[in-house]
């Protein structure tokens, strides 16, 4: 998902340091032109008539040779797909310094970079070697550059916050990025995610996997849904070296709510939208939600926490395979959490299409929430992969577990709407990306109250 990001200070990027800092920088220097070649030719001198001896004349200056035409720069994507010069410069340096082989000697004018659209929390770029450059070993020809979004290094949304509070926010942001990077590296080593090529305070370099992200409509396809369920069950079964207490869900919502209650907008339309959202008495609503979910059994597992179509890759060349054609990516929100949230959140994402190209740059359709039949299809694929002895249970026992799980995930779907609703209000304040964050927040809270009515809670 897309947000404002910092690209560091004026110095060249360094792998050292944890805290991000926004600074100024300069544009990349223009590429030089080729050197002019010199040439000379020997011409015979002419003899003069009369009695005088012939004089040796100095040779005339060499005939001018045509200047070689400057070599055109490597083809680049259209201007609207190019990052700003400062970001391009830093991307080049990161690739040159962190990647081996041909990247080490790559000239800046040979460097290819283009923006990858579609995220809402990070800025993504594809960086590549030119076609004319041969690799020297097994180094990648293409990599993915991820620059962290503001939400990971979130500072207070209001400048009047105390210096101590600002320092705490900076520390928490740095801690979140360190944990996320460790998590990414572990998943890469276990072949459950892309390879990690480089890491630095502002982001990282990842394996570029030939693939495409799923479309929202594909989430409901039976074979796709079944494999997502199996992948999620595998994710939930992992043992990770992180805090096992399920603090993430309500801890994150409380942090976002604290920021939301302090946010001040100057734009009239945003003021009105915020006033409407605050009229829901969000602190009381959060306490009621907490009470409901505390009474809802749900195992604590290692959760992805953002399993939406943009974070699921359909691998190139495996489109027609029955299984193993998908890969989960983007683990920045992953943590130990309640299983019901991860699945309920995924079901909520069936309703939202983030590929819409006009304001507010998303479409919501509450009727796309999975039916009971679709939910049971997902759960029926999930449970055998999650619970080893599930297939040995009786039909009646299986039915009871499935019904309990339906209640679990549909209640925790409420938390998904509440969390991302608050998140979007915060993004409206701190993000520089063109997206209707306040409209999205309203859509999520509309769905939250709709889900409450359906559940009768």
UniProtKB/Swiss-Prot annotation:
Keywords tagged on the record: Acetylation, ATP-binding, Cytoplasm, Disease variant, Epilepsy, Intellectual disability, Kinase, Lipid biosynthesis, Lipid droplet, Lipid metabolism, Nucleotide-binding, Phospholipid biosynthesis, Phospholipid metabolism, Phosphoprotein, Transferase, Tyrosine-protein kinase
Q: Which residues form a coiled coil?
A: none
- What activity regulation does UniProt give? Homodimerization or heterodimerization is required for the choline and ethanolamine kinase activities.
Q: Which Pfam families match?
A: Choline_kinase
Which GO terms fall under biological process for this protein?
Answer: CDP-choline pathway; cellular response to glucose starvation; lipid droplet disassembly; lipid metabolic process; lipid transport; phosphatidylcholine biosynthetic process; phosphatidylethanolamine biosynthetic process
Listed CDD domains = ChoK_euk
Which cell locations does it reside in? Answer: Cytoplasm, Cytosol
Q: Which GO terms describe its cellular component?
A: cytoplasm; cytosol; lipid droplet
Name the pathway it acts in: Phospholipid metabolism; phosphatidylcholine biosynthesis; phosphocholine from choline: step 1/1; Phospholipid metabolism; phosphatidylethanolamine biosynthesis; phosphatidylethanolamine from ethanolamine: step 1/3
Query: Which residues are reported to carry the modification Phosphoserine?
Result: 279
Q: Which GO terms describe its molecular function?
A: ATP binding; choline kinase activity; cholinesterase activity; ethanolamine kinase activity; protein homodimerization activity; protein tyrosine kinase activity
Location, primary (coarse class): cytoplasm
Would you say which domain of life the source belongs to?
A: Eukaryota
Composition bias type Pro residues, residue spans? 55-80
Reaction catalyzed: choline + ATP = phosphocholine + ADP + H(+); ethanolamine + ATP = phosphoethanolamine + ADP + H(+)
Alphabetized InterPro entries for the sequence? Kinase-like_dom_sf
Keyword Acetylation part of the UniProt annotation: yes
Assembly and oligomerization: Homodimer. Heterodimer with CHKB. (Microbial infection) Interacts with PI4KA/PI4KIIIalpha; CHKA bridges PI4KA/PI4KIIIalpha and hepatitis C virus (HCV) non-structural protein 5A (NS5A) and potentiates NS5A-stimulated PI4KA activity, which then facilitates the targeting of the ternary complex to the ER for viral replication.
> What family classification does the UniProt entry report for this protein?
Belongs to the choline/ethanolamine kinase family.
**UniProt disease annotation:** Neurodevelopmental disorder with microcephaly, movement abnormalities, and seizures: An autosomal recessive neurodevelopmental disorder characterized by severe global developmental delay, impaired intellectual development, microcephaly, early-onset seizures, and movement abnormalities.
Q: What does this protein do?
A: Plays a key role in phospholipid biosynthesis by catalyzing the phosphorylation of free choline to phosphocholine, the first step in phosphatidylcholine biosynthesis. Also phosphorylates ethanolamine, thereby contributing to phosphatidylethanolamine biosynthesis. Has higher activity with choline. May contribute to tumor cell growth.
Q: What is this protein called?
A: Choline kinase alpha
Q: Which organism is it from?
A: Homo sapiens (Human)
